[in-house]
Amino acid sequence: MIVLNSKPLIIGLSHLGQIFSVGWASKYGKCSVFDTNNERLNAFKQGNLAKEERFLISSYKKNKNKISFLKDKKEILSYKNIFITIDTPIDHVGKPDYDYLFEFILNLKPCFPQESNIIIYSQVYPGFSRRLLKDVFVDRKDISLVYMVETLRLGNALHEFKYPKKIIFGIDKNKFPQILNKFSCKKFIFNYETAEIYKAAVNIYLFFSVSFANLIDNFCRENNSSYQDLVAPLRLDKRIGKYSYIQASLGISGGHLERDINSIENNFNNHISKKIIYYLKKNDQNRINLLKKKIKKISLNQTIGNVLWVGASYKKEAFSESNTPLSKYIFRNKNIQQLFVYDSFFNLKKKKYKIIKNLKEFNYKKVLIIFNYASLKDIKIIKRIVAKFNCAIIDISINSALRKIIKDSINIYD
């Protein structure tokens, strides 16, 4: 009888796999990693990790000696506990590609040894695990398939992986792998569907909170009121809470909430419930029109030849260009000739805009600045640009230091 290696094998080294492997090595000890994508695998070997995650790179360097690298997928046959940690891809509006994940697992199937534990940590839709049992593992009754819910927040994911308050698992026929007892926090063990719906439920709740804020903001605009004035007292209501997602915005972005919203909408059979989500999405998508109206108002008094967008991601703590205010702006302004983009924290790849690498060198007249986020140092440079060109600046950020430094900035939410 072949004795399998019991230490975890982590397959899929996108953001999620990086967090899992480094977090495991840091807290629990030795692990092995692999990825069928050589670019991701080599980047991980070289320590080119997600820069937006605090302490991830330093923790990797400290614990790299605990991480072993597989050279070939045939080596997977030696491992009993296999974690699938590839991030489910999303497009520019947050639509998930679950077929990619399905094919990723299907192609690995011949490498899964007898009596192995396959733990899915990737983002899935309700019914995905059952589909794997039916369409992939129907002839592999020896395999124990587990779905482990991922609820990590970008920017703080490593800490949350190492110190979870709870973990939800979906299992079949009470098959719970011993290795999962390494996690000493509160565990909730459900069937596949309940665990999968929990993950979706969290994001749907957050989506409804954002929708509430934007809905009331719309109502305030029609009734000579400011929603911004309501946020602080709303947070003091214990039924709402200080950590609630009730800040008005230009709509959800980043792709992570959108992934589950799209999944729930597509899998709902109840017509009324499906319509509720549909119209909330419509309201969310229309929020970008606030920016369009501000720009139109400014253009009545100022010729706008160039636009400088500061802060390309959906937030400064984590990088994603999926469904961001910038991507929405580009989608609705396809004919714009001069769009410049600068980011204080992330290296940008050339897209449909011109990348500014040094704000001090920006020297374009007739410019409108749209501010999302920036470092304090760069905000001071922006102040000098505003003074030099006498240009308008629209602040679309939720909370920033900009308004304290540039008094004439136009708040999108006022």
Region annotations inferred by a language model:
Residues 1-414:
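Structural/interface elements that position substrates and couple domains in central-metabolism enzymes
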